[in-house]
């Protein structure tokens, strides 16, 4: 969770905020390390499902589902990636999808974290203590979500 899980949990927090309820299931190694986790959140704006796995290959893609469409972020969604927007035209009487429009973008650039580095450099140069793009409060919420999930899964930290 603390390695790969931060990406899907951060995406959940950025799009829906901290859940009002959260349920987590996971699989622990013999040493008590979480190898795979599923975190389901209930939010005022909808539901979220975040997964991560340490001992297997995953696509690390993301799908955001809305009332009239989806946004799909391709492999390794946490960096610049391919994006596909699908918008459904809904029948006003039944609410059923009657047609669909797709738009694709390729936002891939080598590296992937240069935007974060540029924002950090900008804020440090300006003498700012935090970024409004991802304020400390958002970082704390992500950590609280992960801590709650890890506790539910059964991860225990050694006491020294």
Pin down the residues of each PLM region:
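A general structural signal for well-ordered alpha-helical segments in protein cores
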Residues: 8-9, 82, 114-121, 143-146
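Rossmann-like dinucleotide-binding domain that binds NAD(P)(H)
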Residues: 1-59, 63, 140
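Surface loops and adjacent helix of pleckstrin homology
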Residues: 53, 74-76
